[in-house]
A protein has these predicted regions:
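A polyampholytic, Gly/Pro-enriched intrinsically disordered region
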Residues: 79-89, 144-156, 217-229
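Structural signal for conserved beta-strand scaffold positions within catalytic alpha/beta enzyme cores
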Residues: 34, 63-66, 127, 153-156, ...
Length: 235
């Protein structure tokens, strides 16, 4: 048994980008709790589980928990509380428990709700680092996000056109993690700014769905999906 519940970061989606330490923790786990969602037609979807299976993790140790996808986070928060209660039962049985998260489990990851609940129960946790999506995106585009003394501003997703314009004017690099949450505001700014490079990504790490472009017109014409990301840098 491990004295800790381990939060394992899976990286952006490409199974080959997971760390050796993370892989070892997965291979030694008695149970792996893995987030999933339900599609509009009722199918259970889990990108995390897909990564685990690609890593040859035994499906029998994977336990899915459904995360409601809604702007009303009350149901999702309740779900995370229930997951923490389930983990508590496994912990009492002295099992090696892993909770997985895409990207890095400490960077805009909802797993912090689970971790906070476990800490309140005096159950110790540890976290294994992973590659966040924006780092993988920069590698795909072969760009440097920030150089020397440049600052980097990371926006979770919601931003107004005025605020985005002001941030661009400061001439710092900007990462917008979930541009679908402010799609119209972002497109309004994109159509009027200059002297910047705009890099747009979808589904980075998922080879058959991966998309990248710098074409402003193409970006504006696209509907931003949930798994999209923007990097804006000065020329």
């Amino acid at each position: 048994m491990s004295d800790f519940v381990t939060f394992v970061s899976l990286g952006p989606g490409d199974a080959e980008l997971i760390s050796l330490k993370a892989l070892k923790a997965l291979q030694q786990a008695d149970i792996i709790l893995c987030p999933s969602t339900v599609s509009p037609v009722g199918n259970m979807l889990s990108r995390s589980r897909d990564i685990l299976l690609e890593l040859n993790i035994d499906d029998s140790v994977i336990s899915l928990f459904d995360v409601p996808m809604s702007k009303d986070r009350s149901q999702a928060i309740l779900c995370y509380k229930e997951v923490a209660e389930l983990i508590e039962k496994h912990y009492e049985k002295r099992l090696k428990i892993v909770v997985v998260a895409e990207g890095d489990a400490g960077f805009y990851s909802s797993t912090h709700y689970i971790s906070d609940n476990l800490i309140s129960k005096n159950i110790p946790t540890e976290r294994i680092a992973g590659i966040p999506a924006f780092i993988a995106c920069a590698a795909l585009a072969n760009i440097h996000i920030a150089k020397q003394e440049e600052e980097l501003h990371i926006i979770p997703g919601i931003i107004s056109s005025n605020d985005l314009t002001k941030r661009i004017a400061i001439r710092n690099s900007i990462v917008i993690m979930k541009p679908s949450q402010s799609e119209q505001a972002i497109k309004q700014v994109m159509s009027s700014i200059d002297k910047v490079e705009i890099h747009y990504f979808e589904n980075v790490g998922i080879k058959e769905k991966e998309f990248y472009t710098q074409d402003i017109h193409e970006i504006i014409d696209r509907k931003f999906p949930y798994f999209s990301l923007l990097i804006i840098t000065k020329e």
